[in-house]
Amino acid sequence: MPHPSPRALALLALALALPVPAAAQQIDWPKVNEEAMRNYQSLVQIDSTTSEAGVAAFVKRTLEAEGIPVTLLAKDPARPNVIARLKGNGSKKPLLIMAHSDTVKIDPAKWTFPPFSATRNGGYVYGRGSIDDKSNLFAQMMTMILLKRTNAKLDRDVIFVSESGEEGASTFGMGYLAAEHFPEIEAEACLAEGGAVIRRGGVAKYAMVQVMEKHGAGAKLVARGPSGHGSRPTQSNAIAHLGQAVARIAFWDPPMRFNDTTRTYFEKLATVSDPADAQRFKDLFDPEKSAAARHYLAENEPGTYSMLHTSISPNIIQGGFQANVIPSEATATLDIRALPDEDMPAFYDLMRKVINDPAVELVPGAPRGEGKPVPAMSTTSDTYKVLEASFQKVYGIITLPTMATAATDMTRLRPRGVQCYGLGAARDDEDTLKGFGAHSDQERLAEDSVYKHLAFYWQAVTGIAGARF
C-alpha cells in the first residue's frame, strides 16, 4: 500500500486545522440544504439571458431579509450588479467572491425540460445556468447568509458580487465595476468561476482550480473572387476558396507548448487517471509519442486538447445572397483562444502559411479582455492552500492548478493585483459529450453537487477569511 506523500499529509493536517466558527457547530445542514436547493432553483428559474434585473432583485431581497446591506450598481438599469459586504476586523485585506448572473440564450424547442423550470429529475437539476454560473452564485449567496446567521468572526471583509454581462457584455458587469467602482470591490484574493470538481461514474476524482486563462484574439478569413452566374462554376469561387481555407485551419494541429501550470496539470492528472489515460498524458511529454496522444485528445477530449496550444474554431461563415449568383466575397469568423504568452503576429503568419491561398486574406481581430495576460496565480499562497485543504475535506480529492481555455471576468481583476482563483461545482465528466454541459440544450447539475458545492464554499471562505483564535 503506497504511503501518503508529504504534501498530502500536509494538506490533511491543514484540512483538519481549518478554522470553524463556534456558531458553525449549530448549523443544521439538512435544513440548510433544503433552503439552498430552493434558492438555487429560484435562481435558475429566472430568465437572465438579456437582463439580470430579476436575479438582482431576488438576491437583494434574499440578503436584505438576513440583515445584509446590499448595493446595486448599474451602467444600464436593466443590467444591475449586486454588491454586499460583511465586515471583518480589518487585520487582513478583503476576500471577494463573485459570480455572474447572466446566461447564454436558449432555443426552447431543443430542451427536454423547459430551460427555466429548474426541473429535478433523476438526481439532477435541469435548466439554463444550472452550471454556468448560478451554481457559484447560489453557493456564494448562501455562504454570505450563513456567515451572517452564525455571526462568524472574520479577519477580513467578505465582499459578494453578483455581476451582470459576463457572457459577452462585461462592459455592464465586471468591466464597469473594475473601471468605475474598483475601491468597492478591491480585495487581496477573489474566488470566481472557471474551475470544477470532476466526477466519473458519479465519484469525485479531482478538483481543478483555474489559476490562468487563455485570452481571446479572433480573426476573420476573407476570400475574394469574381462574381458571376451560378450556371458557370469558376475555379475562383470565393466560397470554394474560403471552404478550403477553413478546412485547413480547422484541422491544423498548432504547435504544442507547455507552461508551468499546464505541465503541472498534466503531470498530476496522470496520477489520478486510469492506466490508459495516464500513459497518454505522459506521452505528451515524449516527442516520439506526443502526436498520437494529441490526435486522441483532439478526437475525444477537445477541452484537454485545447490546453496544449493556441486554438482556432471557425464559428461563423457568411457568403452569397442569391442561389444563382457566384458571390465576390465570403467571410469566416474564427474564435482564437491564445496561450497567455503567444506571439500573435507570428502565429497569424503561421496561419497564413497553413492556408497558403492568395485569394484568402487573414484579418486579425482586436484582442479581447483587459491589458496583457498576467502570470499564473500563486499555488503556494495561503488562499490556494486553503482551497486545496477544503477540497480534501469536503470531497477527499487532490487539486490540480489549471489554465482555462475560455476567458472569464477575472481578466478584469488580475491586472489590478487581485489574486483570482476559478472554482466550480462537481460535474460529470461524461456529460460534456452527451450534451449536458454548460451552454448545452440540456444543461444540468447533480443534486448532490449542489449540496457539496455549498459545503465547499463554506469551508473555503471560513478558512480564508475566518478569524484565528
Report the location of each language-model feature.
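Metal-dependent amide/peptide-bond hydrolase catalytic core
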Residues: Q25, G195-K205, V209-M212, G216-F469
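Acidic/histidine-rich catalytic neighborhood of metal-dependent amide-processing enzymes
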Residues: Y124-V125, I131-M208
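Bacterial N-terminal signal peptides
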Residues: A10-P19
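Acidic/His- and Gly-rich active-site-bordering loop/insert found
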Residues: Q25-R128, L137, L147-R156
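Sec/Tat signal peptide C-region and signal peptidase I cleavage site
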Residues: V20-A24
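Bacterial N-terminal signal peptides that target proteins for export
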Residues: M1-A10
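Solvent-exposed loop/turn segments at secondary-structure junctions
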Residues: T49-S51, P77-A78, G88-S91, S101-K105, ...
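Short pre-catalytic strand/loop immediately N-terminal to key active-site residues, enriched for Gly-Thr
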Residues: N121-D132, T399-L400, D441-Q442
